Amino acid sequence: SKLGYKPDMKAISKETIHISDLSRSAHKGERGSILCLGGSKSMEGAGILAGISALRSGGGKIFWASNTDKLQRPPELIHIDPTIDSIKAAIDKNMSTAIIGPGLGRNFDKEIEFLWNSKLNIVLDADGLDWLSRKKPKKRAAAWVGTPHIGEMQKLLKDDFSDKWSNITKLKKHYGGDWILKGPGTLVSEDSKIWLNLYSNGWLGTAGMGDVLAGIIAGLWASGSNTPYRSAVYLQTQCAKNFLRLNNGAGLTASNISELIGPCIGHYFQNEL
């Protein structure tokens, strides 16, 4: 959709983001546990990308709720069954944040509803956004962010769909929460303002990029960032820039972005990002 630029948009820059610095004595229990409900059979990659990216962005432990088989489970992720009972037990373990939707499928309405009614911070993506458009639940009190691409925006807004500026304000009005509208000219609602990502590159428009972004948001959020939405967008952008600079501007994949999260956070703390 068209951007619909407004003069009171704020540009995302290094000066406007915050990534929490971990103390040398920090342990995994202090860095926040994250639930990832996603990556069902045949879509395991989406859950893995989100979960591993959350770890690389600062999360201490990632509980991956998926019905996938054991051969598809990365050793860094703690696998649990995608049931309300298993999710309840995981939430009791110092959990602060949940990623809902990447590669999930549409057979988990009750589990999504349970998390929606919880006190966890939520990153809602992909099939989680489909649930939102179908069920139209009551607005939640706890913090959450939706991360739609253009097709998901159209499904959420239907006849109200227009330019990005109008879309982000309509989504907040209809559903509550905050929003990251992906694609060229990414818009972010955070701190009661609308933020614009000035960087755009067609290589970011490939499978899995949204899963990585959802993971980055959750990892930064769980580890203490007070601007997790725009910080995640900025960090993903910088990972892409670094890769494309080193590879003559081509061949970027979602896994490349995920692998560069750690180095880019390191550059941030060295004032080189």
Regions found by a protein language model. Name each.
Residues 1-121, 130-145, 150, 154-273:
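Small-residue (G/A/S/T)-rich helix-start motifs and N-terminal tracts that mark the onset
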